[in-house]
Curated annotation (Swiss-Prot):
Protein purpose: A translational regulator that binds mRNA to regulate translation initiation and/or mRNA stability. Usually binds in the 5'-UTR at or near the Shine-Dalgarno sequence preventing ribosome-binding, thus repressing translation. Its main target seems to be the major flagellin gene, while its function is anatagonized by FliW.
Organism of provenance: Oleidesulfovibrio alaskensis (strain ATCC BAA-1058 / DSM 17464 / G20) (Desulfovibrio alaskensis)
Main location: cytoplasm
Keyword RNA-binding: yes
Name under which the protein is recorded: Translational regulator CsrA
InterPro entries associated with the record: CsrA, CsrA_sf
Compartments (UniProt record): Cytoplasm
């Protein structure tokens, strides 16, 4: 992990297109501003982890789950 020290108003770049600016520091809270290209998605870590875990869980569908879903679908079709 790269550790950098920045003061409010100071920035750093990731590559050529991502600019991170320290906006303020108040106690244990740091506000940052992100300038990123419009086609890039930015997630807070806790949101990213939750979505990742849900996607992994969705991939763990068992044969029994598929059979139950098929039976429900056929039952509704009648």
């Amino acid at each position: 992990m790269l550790i950098l020290t920045r003061r409010p108003g100071e920035s750093l770049y990731l590559g050529d297109t991502i600019k991170i600016t320290v906006l303020s520091v108040q106690g244990k809270q740091i506000k940052i501003g992100l300038d990123v290209p419009g086609d890039m998605t930015v997630y807070r870590e806790e949101v990213y982890m939750r979505v990742r875990d849900q996607n992994r869980q969705a991939l763990e569908t068992s044969d029994a789950d598929l059979l139950a879903a098929t039976q429900l679908w056929h039952a509704k079709k009648k």
